[in-house]
């Protein structure tokens, strides 16, 4: 039992180290600055001088954006909640909500071994797949 637990812990720690090695120093520095951060963007009407929140971004303890909300003068326009893979640190799912906080779109992602996006699956709120986006990367020597 102890051997299995040790193996699992080693695998998880190596996975997190390999995920960190995929990130550039700039990306790591950006994530470090965003740990447990909430960013609020405010707008002010030039005539009435009324102020309202335009956008809200919430970052988790690892500096990843887990929620983003867009507002208008009347309230929430939309909201996106992101879920990440614990090992790779890449986005695995995004759920978009409307102004009534009801899901309107679900996106699930697959990633290539080199860290580039491979596929994006788009689902309706009822879970039915309605489209797939495939990413193709073409490098040319010019």
Give the ranges of each region predicted by the language model.
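Bacterial Sec-dependent N-terminal signal peptides
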Residues: 1-23
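Buried hydrophobic residues that stabilize the cores of well-folded domains
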Residues: 20-142
């Amino acid at each position: 039992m102890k051997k299995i637990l040790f193996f699992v812990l080693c695998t998880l720690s190596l996975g997190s180290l390999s995920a960190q090695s995929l990130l550039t120093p700039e990306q790591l520095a950006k994530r470090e600055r965003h740990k447990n951060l909430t960013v609020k963007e405010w707008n002010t009407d030039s005539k009435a001088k009324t102020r309202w929140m335009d956008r809200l971004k919430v970052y988790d303890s690892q500096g990843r954006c887990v929620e983003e909300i867009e507002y208008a003068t009347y309230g929430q326009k939309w909201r996106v909640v992101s879920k990440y893979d614990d090992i790779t640190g890449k986005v695995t799912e995004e759920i978009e909500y409307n102004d009534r906080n009801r899901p309107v779109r679900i996106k699930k992602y697959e990633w290539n071994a080199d860290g580039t996006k491979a596929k994006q699956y788009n689902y309706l709120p009822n879970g039915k797949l309605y489209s797939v986006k495939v990413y193709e990367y073409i490098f040319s020597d010019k």
